[in-house]
Amino acid sequence: VKVIPITTPSGTFKVWTKRFGNNPRLRVLLLHGGPAMTHEYFECFENFLGPEGIEFIYYDQLGSAYSDQPKDDSLWVTERFVEEVEQVRIALGLGRDNFYLYGQSWGGLLAIEYALKYPQNLKGLIVSNMMSSVPAYAEYAEKVLMPAMDPAVLAEVKAIEARKDYANPRYMELLLPSHYQQ
C-alpha cells in the first residue's frame, strides 16, 4: 500500500494505492467509476491479470473509500481529477514505456480526459463501459438504463437528483442494485 499526497487548490490530501504484481514493463493504473466509488470491484482482476504477469495498481480517487474525503465541492471537477491522476502517475514512477491507464465508467471519462492532456505519458489507454461523450451517455441512460429500473425507484432517484442531493446515502442505495449485480 502506498498513500500519495495530492496537491489541490484546497490544500494537500492523501489518496490510497495498492500495487499487485511486479512487471516494470507492463503497469496498469485502474480508475474506478463513480466518482466516489471504490477500487474494490476491481479485486477480481487478481484472478485474471495477476496470472498473466500484468502489474496493476488499485487507486481510490480523492473522495473515495480509503482516500481522504474532503468536504469541498470545488474539488469535484474533471480537470482537478486529471491533475490528481498525473500526480499519482509521477509518485508511482509510471512512464511512457510502461504505463497503461484503464478507466471504467466515470473512470473511463477521466482516462480519456487524462489521455487528451497527457498523451506523452501513456503507452496505452483502455476504456471500459463508457462512451466518450457525456451527452451520448446521458442519452443512453435516459433510453436504456432508466427504463430498466423499477418506476418507484426511478422516481425517487430523479427527486434526489432534482435536489442535487448526491451525498444522500439513499441515492447510492437506490442506484447500486439497479446497475450492479450482487
Show which residues each predicted segment covers:
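Serine-hydrolase catalytic machinery in alpha/beta-hydrolase-like enzymes
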Residues: 65-73, 143, 160, 171
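Conserved HGGG/HGGXW glycine-rich cap/lid loop of the alpha/beta-hydrolase fold
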Residues: 7-69, 74, 89
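Conserved hydrolase catalytic core segment
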Residues: 96-141
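Structured loop/turn residues at beta-strand edges in well-structured enzyme cores
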Residues: 23, 52, 83, 94-97, ...
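Conserved alpha/beta-hydrolase catalytic His-Asp/Glu region
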Residues: 161-182
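Flexible "cap/lid" loop of the alpha/beta hydrolase fold
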Residues: 125-166
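An N-terminal hydrophobic leader/cap segment in hydrolases
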Residues: 1-3
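Active-site loop/oxyanion-hole signature of alpha/beta-hydrolase fold enzymes
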Residues: 58-106
